Amino acid sequence: MTQTDSLPGVQATVQDMGERARRAARVLRSLPTGRKVQALRALAAELRAREAGILAANAQDVQAAEAAGLPAPLVDRLRLSAGALAAIARDVEAVAALPDPVGEQTDEKTLPSGIRVSQRRVPLGVLGVIYESRPNVTVDVAALALMSGNAAILRGGKETVNSNAALEDAIHAALNREGLPADAVQVIRDPDRARMLELLRLDESVDAIIPRGGAGLHRFCVENATVPVIVGGIGVVHIYLDGSFVQTPQDVQIAAALIRNAKTQKPSACNALDTLLIDRAALAALPDVVRPLLESGVEVRADAEAQAALAGAGLNVTSAQLGDYGTEFLALVASLRTVSGLDEALDFIAERGGHTDVILTRDPAQAERFVQDVDSAAVMVNVSPRFNDGGQLGLGAEVAISTQKLHARGPMGLRELTTSKWVVRGEGQVRD
């Protein structure tokens, strides 16, 4: 008896989805690039044609979420607008315009035995993607999976059941129009947690599980899956403001604008600023850096030294507690910590970083040391951490931002959804 046999009434449905996804993956595996491009263009067209229905379904989800008293960041991630849906359609078209990694040949060589070997890039197979209140993920995953030759089984949160159903209908319409199996992308519409549990254990059909959500979701997937899990999307984002970056009024303005963007442009995003580390040599500029945050409604929680520097300029902020460092806020909250220089900043980030970490500096040596020493999925110099995003890094879209080192790290675009196989050709050689 398998573990999933203990879930009566669940296994047959989800197992059937897995079997159908596996059959669809065989079709997608050898699909020419042109067919995949046409399917994505058809999907973008369906999203535009079905705008009213999709937004109406999403409005139902938003209304239910607000009535249930869900936190504002969760509702924010759930909400779609006409502009957001148009952007999602453009993202699909952007994926269609990307180079297709499938079939790429590498490491071609002829060995002394006369055999000719190479590695060929191939799809992973069937992806299981589990996420919370982000309906855009449904389309992002569909587009990336199709373009990379993978099938996908999606399990969104119960908050998105109506939105995801409408989006799945659009995806299936596009696939049917192009003569491709609709089973290439399937959404588990039943919000019962048992459905998710079985997906995690569907190792006979699913090749990888990719969770997108909070730490609790990632932990649940890792602890319960028999399918390999790619963990990511959670982590504390740091910016270290070096003293060399506040030597001119212009640089102070740049730092203030960048830090404000990092925190307020989309505070519910996983790549939004959580902790600002300020070099003691930069404390004189701190009021000019923090004032725009306060004006934007950010609650700043600072250590005593930073508090004193701000109080001297008439700015009052909350006292930071130990738990405020190492916390992913996903809201208009940021912690602030004074450090004695780069060494202390690196030690601090080493204990709490891993997602996206930024240095603001005019010292090239400091910048290079930061890039070399910080062990995170993305390390940035003089740029907002909000750029750690598949679309912003030229991937078109992303399934997730992986913070682990196997199988992929950072935003997972097309290439990260493939693996390789060895191709060996010969003329009848046998091994001695």
Curated annotation (Swiss-Prot):
Compartments where located: Cytoplasm
GO MF annotation: an example: glutamate-5-semialdehyde dehydrogenase activity
GO cellular component, one term: cytoplasm
Taxonomy, superkingdom: Bacteria
One record GO biological process: L-proline biosynthetic process
Protein EC: 1.2.1.41
Purpose: Catalyzes the NADPH-dependent reduction of L-glutamate 5-phosphate into L-glutamate 5-semialdehyde and phosphate. The product spontaneously undergoes cyclization to form 1-pyrroline-5-carboxylate.
Family: Belongs to the gamma-glutamyl phosphate reductase family.
Stated name of the protein: Gamma-glutamyl phosphate reductase
Source organism of this protein record: Deinococcus radiodurans (strain ATCC 13939 / DSM 20539 / JCM 16871 / CCUG 27074 / LMG 4051 / NBRC 15346 / NCIMB 9279 / VKM B-1422 / R1)
